[in-house]
Curated annotation (Swiss-Prot):
Lineage: Eukaryota, Metazoa, Chordata, Craniata, Vertebrata
Record-level GO cellular component terms: cytoplasm; nucleus
Localization per record: Cytoplasm; Nucleus
Organism: Homo sapiens (Human)
Gene that encodes the chain: CFAP299
Protein name (record): Cilia- and flagella-associated protein 299
Main location: cytoplasm
Pfam families: DUF4464
Family annotation (InterPro entries): DUF4464 (IPR027887)
Amino acid sequence: MDQEEGLKALDNIVTQFNAYEDFLDSQITTVDLYYLEDETLARQLVELGYRGTGERVKREDFEARKAAIEIARLAERAQQKTLTSAGKDLQDNFLTALAMREEDNRSGKLSSVIFIRDRNSHGQEISGYIDYAHRLKTEDFEVYFTGKKRLLPRPTDISFYNWDADIAVSNSSPNYQVIADNPEGLLFRYKRDRKILNVDPKAQPGDNSTRITILTELYVQAVIFDHISRRKT
């Protein structure tokens, strides 16, 4: 039996029995009990490999695999519970794009900056850059993925501009340092690997970064910048 088959066989045993003792009992025959007259001794002989009707499984292997399967199960449940976009009927390309990036932004594998230009509830033209991972941690996105509200830039985001009121605000976030005094335009430095994200549409976005324009009916303009950190953690 090769390693892969052995692991598969162990998984079958681990999922079939709640405890190692239950597995040992399944390997004990009525003949064993008749001659040994001691269930504990019979279990010990099975554990040592002297008795049993199947493959010998060590206690430490059983318990380690049992723990690993349980950890994986809990992680999957937590992930399903955490992903706000899961199971939603997404009606727009923009929401689909956010859903595709939600898990990786929550885990830190990816860092996305969202540019949005549109009008607010007062009819004023606004635009701004949103640190997606930070907003995911500080806000419930249920209302956005269900379509009850639109995601819009705020004065608390990494960059915000109200064109009608001529108000410009920038704020560094846990993920990005804002470089607002650059003569060639706004820059963001990703704090994890110190790489620069250039949001100028005429320039390259930077190392390990991409720029994607989203065709959407929700906004006048929507662009997503994706940055993958190469720094080892």
